[in-house]
């Protein structure tokens, strides 16, 4: 028992130490830096200021933040529209086949997402496979310009984040009470009524979780907008990258990071509140 207790203590201390060293302290440094200034040599100056946060209200940066939210929202809706039927299809397959398709869904995670975006860029380029195939079919006369447009950024985000939508949806759909669906059909409910009044409410936790897992990282995937969208389709993640690596304005980059973290925190709070309300509603029913 003593050895077990010592082992548990060592594990707990190790985990806490790791979190403090690599999570708490770095975030504390970022928060502190966001309230400082920089000098002419681009070094952080120990002078307190709120200017870094007020700069975010500048139309240029505020527009990028709103654009990031819009792009993340569109990508989330696209993932939901594509992911829900796919998750439903997975659940309806025989149990022997499901593990194989789930494995194929997870396989892309074994490859770096940056490499996958490079592959997608080649596929969608003016001289890429998609345009060449459509020209061969005679569907188009001249190559379609897809790259370096907002649509290309959306395609890239959906390509990277779709599995994050499918997995929670699959879990929720798999847990559906089949006798309840059969009872609805026996009582005369149409397929549309069954879907809107029973299936959607019961799978809402999976929908909310999937939307959250897609929307939160979508605003920060700067390399997707860099490679697919170009300079005219920046996300807030690109602003943070430029401030830290190019301009070396660390205080403003830190303030932008904290603002993005707060936005994500508000989304998590909304998810938590929505989950509680849904659970209460289910308990009452």
Where are these regions (language model features)?
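Transmembrane alpha-helices
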Residues: 15-24, 103, 107, 159, ...
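C-terminal transmembrane helix and the adjacent membrane-cytosol boundary/short C-terminal tail
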Residues: 2-5, 10-13, 36, 170-185, ...
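N-terminal signal-anchor/first transmembrane alpha helix
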Residues: 1-30, 99, 103, 261
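Short membrane-interfacial helix/loop motifs at transmembrane-helix boundaries
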Residues: 24-61, 123, 127-128, 230, ...
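Membrane-interfacial helix termini and adjacent extracytoplasmic/periplasmic loops
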Residues: 41, 50, 117-158, 192, ...
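Non-cytoplasmic
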Residues: 26-33, 38-39, 115-117, 165-168, ...
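Transmembrane alpha-helix signature in integral membrane proteins
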Residues: 59-92
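Interhelical loop and adjacent transmembrane-helix boundary motif
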Residues: 2-8, 39, 53-60, 218, ...
């Amino acid at each position: 028992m003593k050895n077990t207790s010592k082992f548990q203590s060592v594990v707990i201390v190790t985990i806490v130490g790791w979190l403090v060293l690599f999570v708490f302290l770095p975030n504390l440094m970022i928060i502190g830096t966001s309230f400082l200034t920089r000098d002419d040599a681009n070094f952080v100056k120990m002078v307190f200021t709120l200017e870094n946060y007020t700069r975010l209200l500048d139309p240029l940066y505020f527009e990028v933040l709103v654009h990031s939210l819009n792009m993340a929202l569109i990508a989330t809706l696209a993932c939901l529209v594509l992911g829900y039927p796919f998750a439903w299809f997975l659940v309806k397959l025989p149990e022997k086949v499901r593990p194989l398709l789930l494995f194929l869904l997870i396989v892309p995670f074994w490859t770096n997402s940056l490499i996958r975006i490079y592959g997608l860029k080649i596929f969608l380029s003016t001289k890429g496979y998609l345009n060449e195939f459509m020209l061969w079919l005679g569907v188009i006369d001249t190559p379609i310009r897809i790259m370096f447009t907002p649509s290309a950024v959306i395609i890239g985000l959906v390509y990277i984040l779709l599995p994050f939508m499918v997995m929670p949806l699959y879990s929720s759909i798999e847990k559906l009470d089949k006798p309840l669906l059969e009872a609805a059909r026996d009582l005369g409910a149409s397929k549309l009524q069954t879907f809107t009044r029973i299936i959607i409410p019961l799978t809402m936790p999976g929908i909310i979780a999937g939307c959250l897992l897609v929307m939160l990282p979508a605003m920060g995937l700067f390399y997707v907008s860099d490679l697919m969208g170009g300079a005219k389709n920046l996300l807030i993640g690109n602003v943070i990258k430029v401030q830290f690596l190019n301009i070396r304005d660390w205080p403003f980059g830190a303030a932008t990071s904290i603002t993005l973290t707060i936005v994500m925190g508000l989304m998590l709070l909304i998810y938590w509140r929505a989950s509680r309300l849904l659970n209460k509603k289910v308990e009452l029913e």
